[in-house]
């Protein structure tokens, strides 16, 4: 392998000649060969956008010559466009401030900008990773900013569209199924009737609340630490830089980023991400309940509840011919379990900041973005391959309604709880219908039973 010599404050180090990264990236590769969990692509993209915005603002403020600024901007645009993916090899398990990933971006952009200016990569480069690309910045404000930019982008561009699509599907099903009366269940036991549409309206409402929770978390995440530099005081950042770079990022992304009103909070804590991940966890809890309900209601086809039919997407067994399983529900509940685990990690990370800097940042970012990606992809898959194809089994639903003992609840206002309970117990013990048991006990006449026990009048209409 051909190498070139790069230097940092620790001295010279050999770097692969065909790579754009520099000394600090190479040292990180040597010192943190752990697990292979690379920094998420969303975070790399956010770092590139930050460097682009900073170069533009530093030029406007007279701190960076136009030729260098334009070269850094062009290099950052290449990264944003998906070029040079192999130049960001660092793992999550590194310094807790994300310094090495910040320097990875600085080095790559410095070397690439130098090439764009007609220079070389390496020690003779025309653009310096610290003095030019990282001007007016510190890893301590860059990395928290990248986390917020990546999180807001993931939520608004990927998660919320998937959430809305699934919510709208369930809301349509609620309308389509509104005339289907079914038996309710509490404690996994028969309860009073409701409509299948009412049941699905509950699912849609859960997702509507999650959408509200996520939107409520966004303003905190839109506050950016950039301009706080090392500890939040803004040392070495010029006046106006923080406000201008936030505005530049807002224009670049189309998202409402602003400078944080208190950069000590934004750098020392990860409360915005902890709060937002709580909304992701709540969404995962809702999706687990919805996916579980649907697979239980579709259980069978002959020996289960069988109230719903779901799409048959693939064979379900390597030994039982013809078996089809609720695989989308299974995938959904598994990924939601992973989100619950990620939430624990994010909470521990958020609680573990000391003094002026949280140093669990790469781990928090990794788990947050993992959760957002899982939920976005999981909801899209569940919607496309399950929810849109759900159909009611009307005959089975009607059969279970007629067999339910809990229709006796309609008699409570007329003959009282105790007599109604006697009717239900007698019917259950003797295997008869409620009507037969009620008439045998003499508590009601046939006409009264038929007038009072009417499922269509028991669903709140």
UniProtKB/Swiss-Prot annotation:
Biological process per Gene Ontology, one example term: fumarate metabolic process
Keywords for this protein: Cytoplasm, Lyase, Plasmid, Tricarboxylic acid cycle
GO terms for cellular component: cytoplasm
Site (Important for catalytic activity): 330
The organism's place on the tree of life at top rank: Bacteria
Major location category of this protein: cytoplasm
InterPro entries (UniProt xref): Fum_hydII, Fumarase/histidase_N, Fumarase_C_C, Fumarate_lyase_CS, Fumarate_lyase_fam, Fumarate_lyase_N, L-Aspartase-like
Known pathway: Carbohydrate metabolism; tricarboxylic acid cycle; (S)-malate from fumarate: step 1/1
Enzyme Commission (EC) number: 4.2.1.2
CDD domains: Fumarase_classII
Function in brief: Involved in the TCA cycle. Catalyzes the stereospecific interconversion of fumarate to L-malate.
HAMAP family xrefs: FumaraseC
Name used for this protein in its record: Fumarate hydratase class II
Organism, scientific name: Ralstonia nicotianae (strain ATCC BAA-1114 / GMI1000)
Encoding gene per record: fumC
């Amino acid at each position: 392998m051909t190498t070139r010599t790069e230097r940092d404050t620790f001295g010279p180090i050999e770097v692969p000649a065909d790579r754009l990264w520099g000394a600090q990236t190479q040292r990180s590769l040597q010192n943190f060969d752990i697990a292979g969990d690379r920094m998420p692509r969303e975070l790399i993209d956010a770092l590139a956008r930050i460097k682009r915005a900073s170069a533009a603002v530093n030029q406007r403020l007279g701190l960076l010559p136009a030729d260098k600024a334009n070269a850094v901007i062009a290099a950052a645009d290449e990264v944003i466009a998906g070029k040079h993916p192999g130049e960001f090899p660092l793992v999550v398990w590194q310094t807790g401030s994300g310094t090495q990933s910040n320097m990875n971006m600085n080095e790559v952009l410095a070397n690439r900008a130098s090439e764009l200016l007609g220079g070389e990569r390496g020690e003779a480069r025309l653009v310096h990773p610290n003095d030019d690309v990282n001007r007016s910045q510190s890893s301590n404000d860059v990395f928290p900013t990248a986390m917020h930019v990546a999180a807001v982008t993931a939520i608004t561009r990927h998660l919320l569209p998937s959430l809305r699509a699934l919510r709208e599907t369930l809301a349509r099903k609620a309308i389509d199924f509104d005339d289907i009366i079914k038996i309710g269940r509490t404690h996994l036991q028969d309860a009073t009737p409701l409509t299948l549409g009412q049941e699905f309206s509950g699912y849609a409402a859960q997702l509507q609340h999650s959408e509200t929770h996520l939107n409520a978390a966004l303003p905190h995440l839109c506050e950016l630490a950039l301009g706080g530099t090392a500890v939040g005081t803004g040392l070495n950042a010029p006046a106006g830089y923080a406000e201008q770079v936030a505005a530049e990022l807002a224009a670049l992304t189309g998202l409402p980023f602003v400078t944080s009103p208190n950069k000590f909070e934004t750098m020392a804590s990860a409360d915005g991400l902890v709060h937002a991940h709580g909304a992701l966890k709540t969404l995962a809890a809702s999706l687990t309940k919805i996916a579980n309900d649907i697979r239980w209601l579709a259980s069978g086809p002959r020996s289960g509840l069988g109230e719903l039919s779901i799409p048959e997407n693939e064979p379900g067994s390597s030994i039982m011919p013809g078996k089809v399983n609720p695989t989308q529900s299974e995938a959904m509940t598994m990924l939601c379990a992973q989100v619950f685990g990620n939430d624990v990690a994010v909470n521990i990370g958020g609680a573990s900041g000391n003094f002026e800097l949280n140093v669990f940042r790469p781990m928090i970012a990794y788990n947050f973005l993992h959760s957002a990606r899982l939920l976005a992809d999981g909801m899209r898959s569940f919607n496309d391959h399950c929810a849109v194809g759900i159909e009611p089994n009307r005959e089975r639903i009607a059969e279970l309604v007629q067999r339910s003992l809990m229709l006796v609840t309609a008699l409570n206002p007329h003959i009282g709880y105790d007599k109604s309970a006697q009717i239900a117990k007698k019917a259950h013990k003797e295997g008869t219908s409620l009507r037969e048991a009620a008439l045998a006990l003499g508590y009601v006449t046939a006409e009264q039973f038929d007038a009072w026990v009417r499922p269509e009048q028991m669903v709140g209409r």
